[in-house]
């Protein structure tokens, strides 16, 4: 069929193209942002309200208080409680100044994390009426996030173990009701918070708390809670998460009601009052759909919409937010096609699509795959910074038939795809395992072709996968290892677990290294895990076990006293099974330098794991433990060298076995 040409067609295609606005502003709200019922006439207050600054004396006091809490040298919990109480008492009337100050906001976060129920409620009440202002501020937004997480833990505590004594004392306000005051105050400005640089983070935490989802860490690299800059800053100021993070808290039914109201409010703010539900989808204007799609690819608003799509199924069976973005028809839509193409080629858009398809119904994902991605899988796979991640997500969520279709397209070019995206290898291996080892042999062939080609004379999987020669191996600086080395190391460990050929290739590559170079690996924070991972006694041949042990035994004492190497020495306890000579050689070397080993915190653990006290004092009992280990690991094994009979004496000049020699009483 000839290609369709013409100016009208080009004009139509340009009209259907998705072009998000580049100069979007996130400065001022377009609606009243403080609920009048939250206290006072605050409807005309700007979200960037200035609450004043502390004088020099107050600033010095609060800086010293922050340092005291950071050092945490209190003799007992009661002393710490009294100190926090005195700081809270001193800060009365100055809470808003403290929260919006770059220096003293750290103090507020520490106090919130260390406070008890009464102190926490005091802070909630101090912020009442100004939650929206605090959410929109660079520093106080972090304080508010910490307050929400700590408050979630307190709500669960009140729910599971209600305290009736506080009612008798006149204190009857629960943390649940304080949360409801907060959400009521933020309700009129939820649309603005979605795309605000700081308030969006507060909104995400609030949605996670109300929906009883896991509250992620604020400092981990893979945390979805804060931006990269925020996580780095949090590490620099040395505020560690307490036990309230990386947990799911039970919440009352009122939280679900509030969350439903919040999601409905956000939805109607984007659709000009049209309510949720499949019966109203046709009433939404195209302009509103396009505006919402722009929020989906906005670097600030996109994470919020991802989270909303993740939790909307709790209340809305029609998935109104999903259908505000994507259609439900079986036919292609030009504008939707343009939008999906933008998602597949944009960094923010591909991240959005990757996450939402992992949290919605499979039939919606299948529709997008069938209409817009199925016919061009190889081309999309080459977009290694965008669409490639979407394909990896599809491999996880689609049904078996579609996954096999994708694998049929990707596996023949896997060795090439790995050049730019190592994660493809991991996802394809996992997909193969989930679907009865589909294309297993072809995958292994492609991986070997990439990392250990048979025809190459200088093949080395450590070099091809880990780039060992240009790595930080052997460096003594504090900034190693790198994140990239960690990724490569984890991938090689994945290959080792996948098939024995990768295990043997890794061991062969290690043995081809100079002994000094190989002995550097156990001291490396990342590559030591690779060495530890190959020490699998049941999968490695005896001869290769001996060759590895010959190298590792050269520096066994120093290894046992090292943070990383000690794990390898522990692993050698099982790796030397049925190799009693090597086991005794290691034990003897450690005992010969027992003072050095016992003076090291890591060495003491090795000493304990190897039962070296028994080796020194009761050698027979130690050998009994060794024998029991061998029988447990190899119950059906035979001795490595079968017992042989004594050879007959050659001086007899006879070819007959001694057992068959004639007796002197036998007849000749």
From Swiss-Prot:
It comes from the Eukaryota. One of its GO terms (cellular component) is preribosome, small subunit precursor. SUPFAM superfamilies: ARM repeat (SSF48371). GO terms for molecular function: RNA binding. Pumilio repeats lie at residues 90-125, 126-161, 185-220, 285-327, 335-370, 372-408, 513-550, 551-588. InterPro entries: ARM-like (IPR011989), ARM-type_fold (IPR016024), NOP9 (IPR040000), Pumilio_RNA-bd_rpt (IPR001313). The keyword Thylakoid does not apply. Keywords: Nucleus, Repeat, Ribosome biogenesis, rRNA processing. Residues 1-13 have a biased composition (Basic residues). GO terms for biological process: endonucleolytic cleavage in 5'-ETS of tricistronic rRNA transcript (SSU-rRNA, 5.8S rRNA, LSU-rRNA); endonucleolytic cleavage in ITS1 to separate SSU-rRNA from 5.8S rRNA and LSU-rRNA from tricistronic rRNA transcript (SSU-rRNA, 5.8S rRNA, LSU-rRNA); endonucleolytic cleavage to generate mature 5'-end of SSU-rRNA from (SSU-rRNA, 5.8S rRNA, LSU-rRNA); ribosomal small subunit export from nucleus. It is found in: Nucleus, Nucleolus. Residues 1-42, 637-668 are annotated as: Disordered. Residues 14-30 have a biased composition (Basic and acidic residues). Gene3D superfamilies: Leucine-rich Repeat Variant. Belongs to the NOP9 family. RNA-binding nucleolar protein required for pre-rRNA processing. Involved in production of 18S rRNA and assembly of small ribosomal subunit. This is Nucleolar protein 9. It comes from Kluyveromyces lactis (strain ATCC 8585 / CBS 2359 / DSM 70799 / NBRC 1267 / NRRL Y-1140 / WM37) (Yeast). The lineage of its organism: Eukaryota, Fungi, Dikarya, Ascomycota, Saccharomycotina.
């Amino acid at each position: 069929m000839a290609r369709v040409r013409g100016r009208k067609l080009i004009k139509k295609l340009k009209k259907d193209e998705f072009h998000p606005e580049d100069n979007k502003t996130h400065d001022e709200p377009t609606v009243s942002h403080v609920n009048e019922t939250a206290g006072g006439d605050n409807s005309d207050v700007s979200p960037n309200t200035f609450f004043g600054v502390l004088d020099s004396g107050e600033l010095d006091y609060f800086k010293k208080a922050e340092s005291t809490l950071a050092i945490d040298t209190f003799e007992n919990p009661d002393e710490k409680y009294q100190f926090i109480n005195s700081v809270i008492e001193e800060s009365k009337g100055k809470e808003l100044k403290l929260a919006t100050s770059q220096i003293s906001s750290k103090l507020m976060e520490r106090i919130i994390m260390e406070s008890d129920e009464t102190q926490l409620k005091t802070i909630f009440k101090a912020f009442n009426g100004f939650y929206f202002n605090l959410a929109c501020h660079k520093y106080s937004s972090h304080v508010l996030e910490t307050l929400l997480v700590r408050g979630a833990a307190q709500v669960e505590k009140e729910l599971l173990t209600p305290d009736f004594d506080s009612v008798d004392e006149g204190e009857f306000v629960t943390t649940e009701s304080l949360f409801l005051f907060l959400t009521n105050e933020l309700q009129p400005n939820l649309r603005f918070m979605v795309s605000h640089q700081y308030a969006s983070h507060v909104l995400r935490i609030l949605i996670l708390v109300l929906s009883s989802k896991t509250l992620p860490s604020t400092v981990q690299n893979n945390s979805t809670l804060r931006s990269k800059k925020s996580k780095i800053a949090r590490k620099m100021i040395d505020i560690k998460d307490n036990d309230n993070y990386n947990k799911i808290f039970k919440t009352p039914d009122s939280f679900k009601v509030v969350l439903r109201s919040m999601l409905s409010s956000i939805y109607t703010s984007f659709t000009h009052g049209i309510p949720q539900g499949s019966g109203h989808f046709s009433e939404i204007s195209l302009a509103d759909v396009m505006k919402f799609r722009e929020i989906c690819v906005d670097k600030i608003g996109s994470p919020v919409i991802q989270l909303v799509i993740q939790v909307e199924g709790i209340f809305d069976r029609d998935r109104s937010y999903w259908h505000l973005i994507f259609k439900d028809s079986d036919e292609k839509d030009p504008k939707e096609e343009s939008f999906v193409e933008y998602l597949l080629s944009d960094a923010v858009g591909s991240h959005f699509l990757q996450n939402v398809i992992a949290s919605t119904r499979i039939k919606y994902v299948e529709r997008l795959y069938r209409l817009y991605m199925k016919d061009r899988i190889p081309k999309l796979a080459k977009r290694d910074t965008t669409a490639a991640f979407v394909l990896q997500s599809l491999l996880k969520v689609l049904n078996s038939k579609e996954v096999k279709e994708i694998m049929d397209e990707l596996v023949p070019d896997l060795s090439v795809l790995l050049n730019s995206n190592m994660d493809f290898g991991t996802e394809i291996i996992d997909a193969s395992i989930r679907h009865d080892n589909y294309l297993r042999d072809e995958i292994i062939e492609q991986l070997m072709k990439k990392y250990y080609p048979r025809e190459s004379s200088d093949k080395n999987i450590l070099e091809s996968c880990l780039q060992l020669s240009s790595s930080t191996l052997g460096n003594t600086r504090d900034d190693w290892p790198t994140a990239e080395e960690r990724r490569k190391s984890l991938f090689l460990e994945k290959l080792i677990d996948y098939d024995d050929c990768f295990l043997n290739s890794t061991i062969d590559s290690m043995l081809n290294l100079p002994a000094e170079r190989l002995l550097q690996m156990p001291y490396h924070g990342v590559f030591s895990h690779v060495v530890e991972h190959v020490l699998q006694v049941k999968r490695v041949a005896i001869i290769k076990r001996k060759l590895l042990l010959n190298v590792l035994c050269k520096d066994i004492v120093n290894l046992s006293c090292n943070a990383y190497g000690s794990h390898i020495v522990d692993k050698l306890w099982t790796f030397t099974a049925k190799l009693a000579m090597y086991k005794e050689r290691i034990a003897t070397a450690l005992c010969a330098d027992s003072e050095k080993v016992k003076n090291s915190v890591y060495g003491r653990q090795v000493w304990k794991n190897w039962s070296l006290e028994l080796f020194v004092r009761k050698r027979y009992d130690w050998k009994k433990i060794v024998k029991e280990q061998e029988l447990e690991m190899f119950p059906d094994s035979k001795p490595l060298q079968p017992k042989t009979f004594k050879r007959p004496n050659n001086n007899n000049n006879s070819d007959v076995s001694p057992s068959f020699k004639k007796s002197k009483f036998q007849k000749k």
